[in-house]
Amino acid sequence: MIGKEVTVQDIILELSEVQPEVLPVDLFCEEELPNEQETEEEPDIERISYKVIAPCGCRHCEVKLRIFVHATEFGIRAFQQLLTGDLQLLCPDCRGNCKHDGS
């Protein structure tokens, strides 16, 4: 190459036999995708109705709150962990008396 710019005459291509281990992969192989009907349908997750009884979250309130939920086994366990952890439910009377940031 002479000069700062490359010209077509300066490019020399050497074509040699390609080694078998570096052959390109044929992306259009004989593989076929299954039809939607052939794919397995996900089984319906079993949901069970639960009645949850939890105390009001205010310190001086004796009210027991009843909540009815329809949940999976995993969902009801997660809800149980929330209720025994950081989440506290309030009764309607205590909701008006407690200070809260939400509406």
From Swiss-Prot:
Q: Which Pfam families match?
A: E7
**What HAMAP family does the record tag this protein with?**
PPV_E7
Looking up InterPro entries in the UniProt record yields:
Papilloma_E7 (IPR000148)
Q: What name does UniProt use for this protein?
A: Protein E7
Query: Which residue ranges does the UniProt annotation give for the motif LXCXE motif?
Result: 27-31
Superkingdom of this entry's organism? Viruses
Q: Which organism is it from?
A: Human papillomavirus type 5b
Known function: Plays a role in viral genome replication by driving entry of quiescent cells into the cell cycle. Stimulation of progression from G1 to S phase allows the virus to efficiently use the cellular DNA replicating machinery to achieve viral genome replication. E7 protein has both transforming and trans-activating activities. Induces the disassembly of the E2F1 transcription factor from RB1, with subsequent transcriptional activation of E2F1-regulated S-phase genes. Interferes with host histone deacetylation mediated by HDAC1 and HDAC2, leading to transcription activation.
Q: List the GO biological process terms.
A: DNA-templated transcription; symbiont-mediated perturbation of host cell cycle G1/S transition checkpoint; symbiont-mediated suppression of host innate immune response; symbiont-mediated suppression of host type I interferon-mediated signaling pathway
Kindly list the GO molecular function terms attached to this UniProt entry. DNA binding; DNA-binding transcription factor activity; protein domain specific binding; zinc ion binding
Q: Where in the cell is it found?
A: Host cytoplasm; Host nucleus
